Amino acid sequence: MYIPIITGGKSKEREISLTSAKNVFNSISNLGYKPVILDLIDDDFINKIQNYKFAFNVVHGDYGEDGRLPSLLEILGIDYTCSNPETCIATYDKFIFYSLFKNYIQMPQTTLTNKLILPPFEYPFIIKPRKSGSSKGVYIIHNENEYKFYLEKDLKEFQEVLVQEYIKGREITISYIQKNEEFILLPILEIIPKKEFYDYEAKYTNGLTELKPQLNSPEKIIQKINEIGNHVMQTLTFKDMFRIDAILKDDEVYVLEINTVPGLTELSDLPTSALAAGISFDELINIIIKNHVARVAG
């Protein structure tokens, strides 16, 4: 079976997407299938993709996670990995996500702006783009000068920016994979960056972050995480895999965002969580391919 891997695109996460695609390509080949790389920006992409009935989506950021690529594939009648357009839209737009869930799960207080406003929170606080990933454009703001500089910088690049309460605690990531129509919670990862926070450089530079599996998390924390996971899965329709980024403080779990097309690089969170559960990268990819086979058979 030929399996096209859709990668690249024009987003600011293009390079991460290409790295994910390389890893998935090698794994699909190891599993005995025939992988094909298709770059979303190729002129003949639409003609090429119509030769297949299934596609592996590793386009991070714009197009891949904002619902546009899944919408195109559905129009073409092509099954694909990861979540449907509606779920992608509701999670990639961080303010829509906040608005949907702020009354049901713990989240940092957040406001949206498209201009320079008075700081709504005491320093430090966070600013981040309304729509972006891999911590692009995310800054911890400590004073007025930083606020003006980084807010103006983000507004020029992203048009709309979230100003968010800073919750100082332990950064964790919560990964789920789908197997036999059921989502499995993988071991929680504690993220320990050597920088002030888990920014783009810390995520994708070897040695700048320790990803520490929490194999014996307190039952109280696991229960809260399961409640969060169950609530978002009852509200939105996920497929194959997804990841929740959160802050753990005083036994409370504060949800930051959800990633519907998790990174699959050697340094990415979800494969690290899977490995801590005894699931190799090849096994992870095979589970996802088997999900497709089950969907088609069903």
Curated annotation (Swiss-Prot):
Protein name as it appears in the record: D-alanine--D-alanine ligase
Binding locations of Mg(2+) 2: E257, N259
Subcellular location: Cytoplasm
Residue positions binding ATP: 124-173
Pathway the protein contributes to: Cell wall biogenesis; peptidoglycan biosynthesis
Source organism per UniProt: Petrotoga mobilis (strain DSM 10674 / SJ95)
Xref: SUPFAM superfamilies: Glutathione synthetase ATP-binding domain-like, PreATP-grasp domain
Any one of the GO CC terms: cytoplasm
Catalysis performed (reactions): 2 D-alanine + ATP = D-alanyl-D-alanine + ADP + phosphate + H(+)
GO MF annotation: an example: D-alanine-D-alanine ligase activity
Positions bound to Mg(2+) 1: D245, E257
InterPro entries: ATP-grasp (IPR011761), ATP_grasp_subdomain_1 (IPR013815), D-Ala_lig_Van_CS (IPR000291), D_ala_D_ala (IPR005905), Dala_Dala_lig_C (IPR011095), PreATP-grasp_dom_sf (IPR016185)
Gene giving rise to this polypeptide: ddl
A GO BP entry: cell wall organization
UniProt entry tagged with the keyword Transferase: no
Domain ATP-grasp, first and last residues per copy: 97-290
Cofactor-binding details, from the entry: Binds 2 magnesium or manganese ions per subunit.
Chief localization: cytoplasm
Biological role stated in the UniProt entry: Cell wall formation.
Similarity comment: family membership: Belongs to the D-alanine--D-alanine ligase family.
Requisite cofactors: Mg(2+); Mn(2+)
UniProt key word Ligase: yes
Top class in the EC scheme: ligase
Keyword terms, alphabetized: ATP-binding, Cell shape, Cell wall biogenesis/degradation, Cytoplasm, Ligase, Magnesium, Manganese, Metal-binding, Nucleotide-binding, Peptidoglycan synthesis
